Amino acid sequence: MPPIGLSTSRTTHTKQTNVPKLWLVMVGVNQYQDEYLPNLNYSAIDCQGLSEALTEAATQFTQKIVNVYHDFAPQPPSLTNVRHSLRDITSHVSPIDTILFYFSGHGVVDPTTQEVFLCLVDTQKSNLQNTGLALQEILQILGKSGVQNQLVWLDACHSGGMSLRGVTLQLVELLQQSAAKSKGFYALLSCDNNQQSWEFPELGHGVFTYYLIRGLQGEAVDSQGLIYLDGLYRYVYHQTLQYIDKTNQQLRLINQQKRGKGDTQLYNEYPLQTPKRIVEGVGELILGKRLEKNAPGVYRGLGIVVEGLSNSKITLDISKLLGSTGDFAVEYLPATKTSSEDIKAAIARHWQQPQAELTLLYLRGRIEESEAGEWLRLGEDICIKRSWLKQQLRQCTSQQVIILDCPLGTASLGDWIEDLQIESHHGQCLIACASPPEAPENFAQKFLDTLTASAQGDGLSAAGAIAQLQLSLADSKTPLYVWLSGTQGIIEILTNNTHKSQRTSGLDLGVCPYMGLNAFAEADAAYFYGRETVTQQLIHHLRDNSFLAVIGASGSGKSSVVQAGLIPQLRQGKHIPNSEQWGIKTIRPGVNPLEALARKLGEWGETHLLIEGMLHQGVEGFVYWLRSLPQGVTVLVIDQFEELFTLAPTPDRELFLELLLGAVQYAGDRFKLIITLRADFIAPCLEVPALAEALQVASVLVPPKLSLDDYRRVILHPAQQVGLQVEAELVEVLLRELNQSVGDLPLLEFVLEQLWQQRTAGKLTLQSYQEQLGGIKGALERSCQGVYESLPPQLQECAKWIFLSLTQLGEGTEDTRRRIYKSDLIVKKYPAGLVEQTLNVLTNAKLVVINLEAEIEAQGKSFSPTPPNLSTPFVTVEVAHEILIRHWSTLRWWLEENRDRLRKQRQINHACQLWQQSGKQADFLLQGARLAEAEDIYIYWTDELGADVQEFIGACLAERKHQQLQAKNRLKQAQRAVVALSVLGIASVSFGGLAYWQGREAQFREIAALNSSSQANLLSHQQLAALIASLKAAQQVNHVIAVPNNLKLATVTTLQQALFEMQERNRLEGHKDGVISISISRDGQTIASGSLDKTIKLWSRDGRLFRTLNGHEDAVYSVSFSPDGQTIASGGSDKTIKLWQTSDGTLLKTITGHEQTVNNVYFSPDGKNLASASSDHSIKLWDTTSGQLLMTLTGHSAGVITVRFSPDGQTIAAGSEDKTVKLWHRQDGKLLKTLNGHQDWVNSLSFSPDGKTLASASADKTIKLWRIADGKLVKTLKGHNDSVWDVNFSSDGKAIASASRDNTIKLWNRHGIELETFTGHSGGVYAVNFLPDSNIIASASLDNTIRLWQRPLISPLEVLAGNSGVYAVSFLHDGSIIATAGADGNIQLWHSQDGSLLKTLPGNKAIYGISFTPQGDLIASANADKTVKIWRVRDGKALKTLIGHDNEVNKVNFSPDGKTLASASRDNTVKLWNVSDGKFKKTLKGHTDEVFWVSFSPDGKIIASASADKTIRLWDSFSGNLIKSLPAHNDLVYSVNFNPDGSMLASTSADKTVKLWRSHDGHLLHTFSGHSNVVYSSSFSPDGRYIASASEDKTVKIWQIDGHLLTTLPQHQAGVMSAIFSPDGKTLISGSLDTTTKIWRFDSQQAKTSQMNTLVMSACNWLQDYLNTNPNVTPNEQKLCPS
């Protein structure tokens, strides 16, 4: 902290004399010049700290004049400085002022005169009269000042070898005399007679001044927040006395331990120090007041409380008390809900916090030991070894308090205390206790009582806690083991809270008291509220009955009220006598209820196999076994009783019910049965007579809704249990948003859990609810959808599979949860690793629950601290709550889409189980229609069937074939008497029919396999193979009769997908080693390639190899066509350049001259010269006719890799291994400039056709664009993942192609924005070039191939990148300008032809919608700041801001005449504005949720609006009256637009559909389905024949008006928010959250590619050259497309 040394000028002193001032003279001396005065450690810092505390606290003095003198201040504490300061002050003070003199240092009595002197830095002990500051002098100066209050604070009784100890009688008398003379005198002395001032290193101050500072900082305030001088004295006196007393208490305990070990080196205790005051006439002087500080919470200590036995309320209360009064940041970890890894990580994390003064660890568990060692067990599966814990303690640098609460008794706790001891000056306290079995919470309660007693008093030190615990446990059977070390500082568990202000924020123990989608368990009873009345009803019924049915709707909380309400009450034994001794077990029936029952009952000692055998003996055996149990009464809870009717086989269900109901009847005194049952399953239960009778006797209905008071308890009381606060406003909003429906309770629990995750400083806030969750309605939907959409595509597919598998399809009832074995999810399509990865995400999101109980039972109780293996078949999986099935629309849609198939598939699975249980008897095989269904499933869904089901279907098919063969043989025998010719004819027909059907089934399987192969090849970038496989499938579909519609659709979709994604046009194969270079003749008809195989090959444009040039003795690195195409130049590793005649391959000449490899050759534009670049650091210029060397260009300091001529031939550019590009003048070889910027070799160069730009490719993974005129770097293109080996401009200069060692080619526009990546090469790509006057790119690779590429059939013409996320796009009326807007709040205007940015209209917050006026002069924006803005297009000036909406504005639209502007908002309204003056016209009210979209009809008479309330509303634009409301979709409606003639409306929705409506009567014409996610918007083409839709699935789809899908544009990398046609209908623009806007060419004829024959024709056109010329194409493939 900076030193304070402030003196105020005399002129300032004289001003405002009527205002009381505070004059401070503060002196502190550490270092003395006199060797006979020992130096001190803390006096200077005492002075500094007290000065700052006084300056800050004394706010009632508007003027404070501070004079500070200490070792670190600008002015030293010399006699001259201090004396001058005192005299100067007395000459300027007013009577109403206050003077405070403070001194910290040595005080000495002159032995001759008995005068008291304060020793300053230059005081000489031998000459006190002349060098010391006499106290008498100070008092005289203060007395003459005449001020109202004179304060003298002295800390001058320090130890350190001085002969004087304590305050002498002379000093006291002198101060008393001065007090008597003064009307207002107050002296504070650091100690009394015969005492001395103590300094403690851990305080960093003398103890007296330390508490002066603390008191002024707020701890000495009274109830009004004021600091009185007397109050400050009492605070300092008490705290000083207490601190020394606690220190001595700790030292006594440590010395006691030392004596016990025979150690004689004991610590001395500190004599008492009691500050003294001398006062006269001051009265109640207010010295300061508490300052309100908004500093973030800083905790003194860190605490972890681990509850490892049961969820004891006592340990939770300990955590709350530590957190609320002990300045602790406390984390409470119940072992039942925390993994071993998390507990160990938390302990390790807390030990490594250097800022903590104290770290406290409370572990409640049981000590266990075996031959393998000894550990502390927390819960069932968490084990903490002593060695591990000691290692953690050694890493801790703060004070430590470790408490081991280990009930049930153990002899080894003493060993733990002995082993965990660490000698540390910082301090360590170990406490261990073993409560007896009859009172397992005895120690925890005593510890809590000890904390509670000290919480609001003087605090609690570790030594004090030990003493109190020893006293309170003295008469019990609870042994206590302790250890205490540390001599520097008191280990304070609780600090003094007497003077602390109340905590205003909530606690954050890290415990979520809300269950989310999970049911409450018994361990959660402390947080279970709202069902107290129902719980009492259950207790009442169970008291007098042996059977109890708890019935309620799905989501009503049946399981929770039994587990967290009833069972904990029974275990307490307060309501039913002796119920605490009952044995209680809970099961779910599942698919094998008898086995589940046997496993659970086996926990009482018998093996589950023995019990299962006993159960099969019937009721008599079960009753006998129940009566033999020692616990008296056995309670069996069957949760989700309806599983007996949905999952269990009928024979098992009947036996199970017979056993349990028989036990109720014949052993009712020893057995009680409790079931939870969904209300919609009462009917099947009533069909069982005994069960129906029981239900009528004892059933309790759990109401689906709670009262508002109960809902309030559900919100508030769990939070109070863990110290959380809930804002009152939040509670009221939550209660208001409840719909009073069945699903309210689980949705509320889910929202509360989400709020807990968003908590702030231990508080649940309304702000978090509104900003993060957006309301109860839709919170679950948003959360589920968010988790699903965060998954990569492969995991999304697996998640869909999992959720469908975990849903039990309702048969006249609602769909329900379905619990299955995890192993059942693993099939060929979804292997174990994929399922495991997906389940991890879903379980972490708490959407799915994995149950390990069955597995643990199967393995037996293990003491291994490692977690159970999740891969065993005993692990079950289920959806967290059935509310998820009802409220997640995506899952609902999946279910509706797959319901029939799933039902059939599960029927087949059930038939398979029966077949296996029968020993695979043929009688259980499927036949007829059921077999046909199974066959369809087998053909199309093979990879989703388990191996056992596939075996079953295979056996069914084999049996059918066997029966067909038998039928055929019987037919032959019956026809033997018939004429031979007739017999042969009939047999022929029979054979033909059988063969036909068998062949047809095989063809279907082959088509499906080809489709799968195509998709797999696409994923692995084998595009040609993918298209060929898909073409084969399509050809087969065209030649097979009655292909199932779903197979035909899959084939069309696969072929369409392959065509849309095709990039590779042809593959030229013939080289035997990597291809390094290619060159293309100017007419584009010939391609030359140079290879590591030492050859040059010439290829025709269609891929035919027509000549190989041999002559080089080593690798050919470069080939180049002359401008006229008559000559080819080549260079390579043999250091030569060769010139060849193109027409016949004749070698014209060999040019030598380079001393190392020739890396590149290139002809001048006029063809007269050839430039060569070499590893010998040079570029050489040659005459092409004679081969003579014309010039050598030097300057590069390393090998030259590339050389190029500018288009005008006047400049030569070269790139080198020295990381530079150099430019030379061709005529004289003069070096023009050097371009620096690359970080690695420059591998390739290319001039733009206009010669103004140079592109360079480098091994630093970048391409750079340079302006030739001045050599300035224009742009760096980044995207490749490895060295870039080649770069070239297209002939029109609009595109750039680059080739890289990362196996890819990238296409960029001239602005450096990436347009496309071509992937398929299996080796690094060394060369790339454009075929002249075409959109085909050739590439050469180390994979020995040359490949020809063409951009996909549907690909963007241009990509605009400017906004951070594009929400809206719009065309100017003439199509010349495109406007984009988005998350960054800016509107950007672009030229539609070349994509250049014209201007940016800056904004603040996100813009969700934009609209041009029909005249094109204005543009309006819908803004997140609740406003609408209108801009002038020509200059970008903001003209008006329209204010009126109460929430974000989503959409704006101008009327056709441009006079009215409509805006749609999140405030549920549409507003109309006058454009000319910006005045508000009217509000259209009616929607019940936010309005996303608004549009005018073409005649301007009707306004259409789309809303989150799932409706479209039509309004009269003049009156604002509602014309019609259309219940349009099953989810949020995002947009609605009129077609050009106003006769139709198109709407889009979160239900993933586009719908077409007749506008005059609202009749639904078509529903367009195909998007896989939310559809945000749509637009009509200008001729009204097509609709474009934009979706979160990253695609734009184009539809015919009859609902036929024309094409899909799949290029975006994130959701597409907007897609609109240009006014001329020839282009389409799409704006996406991937930050880009893409401009697409739209040709309606080319786009019409979803008809099979058209697709086949397109595929054949694409493949023609490849099939005709590639040597590796098979003969059958060559016949795929006959001419």
UniProtKB/Swiss-Prot annotation:
WD repeats lie at residues 1070-1109, 1111-1150, 1153-1192, 1195-1236, 1280-1318, 1320-1359, 1361-1400, 1402-1441, 1444-1483, 1486-1525, 1528-1567, 1570-1609, 1611-1650. Gene3D superfamilies: 3.40.50.1460, YVTN repeat-like/Quinoprotein amine dehydrogenase. GO terms for molecular function: cysteine-type endopeptidase activity. It holds the Pfam family WD40. Keywords: Repeat, WD repeat. PROSITE patterns: WD_REPEATS_1, WD_REPEATS_2, WD_REPEATS_REGION. One of its GO terms (biological process) is proteolysis. InterPro entries: Caspase-like_dom_sf, G-protein_beta_WD-40_rep, nSTAND1, P-loop_NTPase, Papain-like_cys_pep_sf, Pept_C14_caspase, WD40/YVTN_repeat-like_dom_sf, WD40_repeat_CS. This is Uncharacterized WD repeat-containing protein all2124.
